[in-house]
Amino acid sequence: MGTVMTVLGPVPASELGAVTMHEHLHLDQYAEAEGTTPPERVALLRDCAIPALRRLHDHGCHTLVDATPMPMRAEPWVYAMLAREANLHIVLATGFYREAWERESWEYAGCPTYPHRWMDPRVAAWDVEALADLLVQECEQGIRGSDVRAGIIKLASTRTAFTPLEEKAFRAGALAQRRTGLCITTHVEPGLEPLASPVAQLDLLEAAGADPSRVILGHVQPHLVRLPGEVRQCLDRGASLCITNLQAEGNDSYWRAVVDAIRRLFDAGFGDRLTLGLDWAFDNVTGPFVSCSWMPLPPYVYLFTHVLPRWKEFGLTDEEVTQILVRNPARLLPRV
């Protein structure tokens, strides 16, 4: 099975248990560079995140993938502290976010002010090879001079058409994936109309040399229902999916349609390519740094206490849940 790089070092994939594959422990929407994590944020994470993370073990979940890119992350030591105190495996990302290149995308997120961009300024200043070197350094040597190493590469885009800086970041991520053997996990924008294309991301990554079997296309929950042809095309080419932003309350007909789409993918032989995450975050999207503004409580464990019980009522089986949460992450997260 191989080993997975966590913030406390390598862990055998057989020890991961269930894995929630796309979360955020510290998401600073206004950061322009990575600096010191304010002590009040660390206190919030100690008081609110750690109890929720400990509860994950009650459901057989021993691993969380933090998909937060530069410069939105906390200091590396914060993740190591959370992992130790929650006794949880945390896989931390390296990588770059998308550009807030149109006011609509910023206002959709509920942010009170409109910045120039979300993307790390080094993407504009450095060439593709230097950016790839930075990603590889964080994976193989450590993040910001620490011994905390990244275990996955995060990339993001806003629309089907990439901005020049988004394309540059994707090319750097593809180079880093080839050099490290780690998976790429992406942000396919799920909230703006028309829906962004996961195929466009896969096209660019493949053209830049990435292995499609090491690509996880993220936030594709609405695509399962509305763009099933695009989803199937990505799966046919070897990619995996991360289905996120999951809720248990309200709109039963829609969530039943999501579960039906997942079960059809199992029937078509693609059950080994599916993963789940909430996209839960402690963040400052509305100004102050607080609990997630777009997902219900409780943090992280909501997937197990609310979503999966409801989805099982809609027909998802225990065997399918085990495949999605245990076997698939154990295959995807080790470097190859």
Which residues make up each language-model segment?
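Active-site gating/metal-coordination segments in enzymes
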Residues: M81-E85, H89-V91, G95-C183, S240, ...
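Histidine/acidic-residue-rich catalytic or RNA/ligand-binding cores of hydrolases
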Residues: Q29-A33, P76, E102-E104, P194-D203, ...
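Catalytic pocket-lining loop regions of alpha/beta-barrel enzymes
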Residues: A174, R178-F266, R273-L274
